[in-house]
From Swiss-Prot:
The gene is 20. It holds the Pfam family Inj_translocase. Its main location: virion. The lineage of its organism: Viruses, Duplodnaviria, Heunggongvirae, Uroviricota, Caudoviricetes. Keywords: Late protein, Viral genome ejection through host cell envelope, Viral penetration into host cytoplasm, Virion, Virus entry into host cell. Inner capsid protein that plays a role in viral DNA ejection into the host cell. Ejected from the capsid after penetration the host outer membrane and has been released. Assembles into a structure that extends the extracellular trans-envelope channel formed by the internal virion protein gp7 and probably gp16. This channel allows the delivery of the viral genome into the cell cytoplasm. GO terms for biological process: symbiont genome ejection through host cell envelope, short tail mechanism. Signal peptide: none annotated. One of its GO terms (cellular component) is virion component. It is found in: Virion. The keyword tRNA-binding does not apply. Residues 446-464 have a biased composition (Polar residues). Coiled coil: none annotated. Interacts with the internal virion protein gp7; this interaction forms a tube-like structure that may allow DNA ejection through the host membranes. This is Internal virion protein gp20.
């Protein structure tokens, strides 16, 4: 615990307490205040009382009281309670001490008996409020001193000295302010002022949290509307692709004159003759057919390739470009959109604004991350349909499906790049499910060719619009 050594006999209040209290401020610490009091000639000529000087003179007899053994014990106990309150940030122990030691409080109040009620209220109110601001950190304390500069000057306190002491010896200054507020106001009023001030800070925090929550809700609602619109667009596109496939199947050539049998191309480039009846449903739906080697096979409906569209090709190229941009970026270039307020799918607060201020590269990285997140949400919509859902119509449904998808992690640059690599791996695995290897589905034909002759390279697009390449 920091200790104080009495320097000179300056100021009744601090001299009285400082001689016995190792935690009290040094008397010389208020020389600037007393100098300001002596220079306040206008107030002296007008006959107005200088509040701080009057209060300090009225405390001159406190030292004699503190010399008593019983009062010394109370003072030591007060020092310990204050040290605990400062260390924990919980002032409840001080209030309890004041209730259990009324004699100590009464002696502190005697020091202010020479002031009228208004003067005591002003000094005590300023002391307690300054103490609360001091506990909230240097920025809050400096703002309080600046905002109340005139009030402090009126009671003879030098704002510059207050700021300097608050920076150099905050715990010791808090000790002095606590003692002054107890003496000027009494414990009930002093801690009522504290609770009211802290309560306002809590209310401000709650208001800010409400505003953030409302903004988040509005953003989520807008995102949900966008998801619904994208889902409707995808439904229309899926319907068009279905019509195209139906037309292709209707025009497919038949084999051996068998009605209903047709030749289709698999995602791995081979052709298979399949029957017209679809067995099963959803992801397990399949056709029965015969490959070119005479093998009886079951062909998953999802393995039948559709011709790639220019839109799908462009999207997949853009996805790869965005993933490479973030994965290969320097970690320091991602600081602007990551941090404590960032999370899964949500960039750090203010990332959009910072990306506009920090340069072209940061803006491109921010847009790349947003596009990747949007495409992963689109894949969530596709996955929902694969599970049999007709679409995503509510925010709750969207959150449920998106939780199962990899998302961009904005908590730190390293976490962001790792999540991008996981998204790339997920996309690759998602595409691989369409590279169907029919395998040994039946008896081998003598016409069987080596595996190297069975596979054909090329690019194809799945029913969900995902492009993949067979090498």
């Amino acid at each position: 615990m920091a200790t104080w050594q009495q320097g000179i006999n300056s100021g009744g209040f601090l001299a009285g307490i400082g001689a016995q209290n190792e935690n009290a401020p040094k008397a010389r610490d208020i020389n600037a205040t007393l100098g300001l009091i002596r220079e306040n000639n206008d107030l002296a000529r007008s006959g107005a009382n200088n509040v701080a000087l009057t209060g300090l003179r009225g405390l001159a007899g406190v030292a004699d009281i503190y010399n008593q053994e019983q009062q010394q014990k109370a003072l030591n106990a007060f020092n310990q309670v204050h040290a605990n309150a400062w260390a924990t940030g919980d002032p409840s122990g001080l209030f309890k001490f004041a209730q259990e030691n009324p004699a100590f409080v009464a002696q502190a109040q005697q020091a202010f008996s020479g002031l009228n009620e208004q003067q005591r209220n002003d000094m005590g109110d300023l002391a307690m409020k300054a103490n609360v601001a001091l506990s909230q950190g240097p920025e809050a304390y400096s703002k309080f001193i600046t905002d109340n500069k005139d009030r402090l000057n009126r009671v003879g306190a030098n704002p510059d000295w207050m700021i300097q002491t608050g920076v150099q010896n905050p715990e010791q200054l808090s000790h002095m302010l606590t003692t002054m507020s107890l003496g000027a106001l009494g414990p009930e009023k002093a801690f009522a002022v504290q609770d009211k001030m802290v309560g306002r800070e809590i209310d401000r925090g709650r208001l800010a949290e409400t505003i953030r929550s409302n903004k988040a809700g509005e953003g989520l609602q807008a995102r949900g509307q966008n998801i619904t619109m994208r889902g409707q667009d995808m439904s229309a596109a899926t319907a068009r692709r279905g019509q195209d496939l139906a037309t292709q199947r209707a025009n497919a050539r038949t084999i051996s004159g068998s009605e209903g049998n047709r030749v289709v191309q698999l995602a791995d480039g081979r052709t298979v003759s399949v029957g017209g009846k679809l067995h099963g449903a959803g992801a397990n739906a399949f056709y029965e057919g015969i490959d070119d080697n005479g093998n009886m096979v079951r062909v998953p409906a999802s393995a039948i390739a559709a011709p790639p569209t220019s839109a799908a090709s462009a999207q997949n190229y853009a996805m790869k470009k965005d993933i490479d941009a973030i994965a290969n970026a320097d970690a320091s270039a991602l600081d602007f959109m990551t941090g404590m307020t960032g999370g899964a799918g949500n960039p750090a607060i203010g990332a959009d604004v910072r990306s506009r201020l920090t340069g072209k590269e940061q803006r491109q990285l921010y847009n790349s991350a947003q596009r990747i997140q949007g495409r992963m949400q689109n894949q969530g919509v596709a996955a929902a349909r694969d599970m049999g859902a007709s679409g995503i119509n509510t925010i709750a449904e969207a959150k449920m499906y998106f939780q199962g998808m990899p998302q961009v992690d904005y908590s730190s640059p390293e976490a962001m790049q790792q999540s991008i690599r996981e998204i790339q791996e997920y996309t690759n695995n998602y595409n691989q499910q369409y590279n169907v290897n029919v395998g040994n589905g039946g008896l081998k034909s003598p016409r069987q060719q080596p595996d190297t002759q069975q596979s054909a390279g090329g690019s194809y697009t799945s029913k969900s619009g995902i492009k993949f390449t067979v090498e």
